[in-house]
């Protein structure tokens, strides 16, 4: 599976990038038909503490799955996004088995 990590207006350090790849690869264990994934990291332009945004798009056969989460840290936002994608993958997997 191909994993693309993009950041908007800042450089991602290697530690965060390796964490992202590790979390996304764990999703492929749950559902093996993931073709690729795009992860976008952004800093929201607000005065609140929760200004780190993580968007994850998984390309699978048929439809793409998407999750966007905002939190205090990129790690926490990534955890929340991958948890949401796990639920979506489980639901999608159930639909595929019914067909």
For each of these PLM feature ranges, what is it?
Residues 1-99:
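N-terminal, polar/charged subdomain of small-to-medium soluble alpha/beta proteins
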